[in-house]
């Protein structure tokens, strides 16, 4: 007779237990999607790193001074099965990426993410550079939450997770879109056939080739003029020797044979006759 009266109480207790909010399941989903920074920067995405915009003014309403903002990095196929850690000991470090496909890094306090204009005149872009700590690979005793370079092109997905001082999650953002890193090409895979080039590229190449030919011709002409003096040296003007006589130009006069025959013996043209000293 007493059993039917206890059964409704058991059902009521079960409903209360199931309906009681669990701390691990009451996460606030923040309508924010992490993305690559929109700042005009070189190398926003490289072969081992990528730069995210900082989540400023995103987690302020859900956090306290003792909370920590974590970045969760996962392969795209592992992001669907990622389970938020419940304690600090369960937070996965960077080596777990190669085994479990995800890890957490870049712990930040709310003081490091001020809600203000990022263009503060310091000249530094407010970004979070994932995979920027190259020293992690060389340090055998690397920090637990080291920001090591990413091992492959991905693709990756990231999200921000807010935890309290005990490591219990409080809020999280959406997962980002796919982030693929850059990949280098082997020299043999690069097609150098001119037919693959665009028309503008062919015109520019032709103009540069013509200019190079003109410069070469100008160089050869200048070189030939410069070294011609070495091949054919100029003749130096004849120098006068010491003791040489330099006088006015003398014009000779032609004397007809008839006049030369009438001159007395012993006389020459233009000379007076001298008396003979012979007896």
From Swiss-Prot:
Glycosylation site residues: 77
Bridged cysteine pairs (disulfide): none
Residue intervals on the Cytoplasmic side: 222-279
Subcellular location field: Cell membrane
Positions of transmembrane segments: 201-221
Main location: membrane
N-terminal signal peptide: 1-26
Lumenal side: 27-200
InterPro entries cross-referenced by the UniProt entry: Uroplakin-3
Membrane protein topology class: Single-pass type I membrane protein
Expressing tissues: Expression is urothelium-specific.
Subunit structure: Heterodimer with uroplakin-1B (UPK1B).
Entry function: Component of the asymmetric unit membrane (AUM); a highly specialized biomembrane elaborated by terminally differentiated urothelial cells. May play an important role in AUM-cytoskeleton interaction in terminally differentiated urothelial cells. It also contributes to the formation of urothelial glycocalyx which may play an important role in preventing bacterial adherence.
Protein family per UniProt: Belongs to the uroplakin-3 family.
Protein name (Swiss-Prot/TrEMBL): Uroplakin-3b
Biological source species: Bos taurus (Bovine)
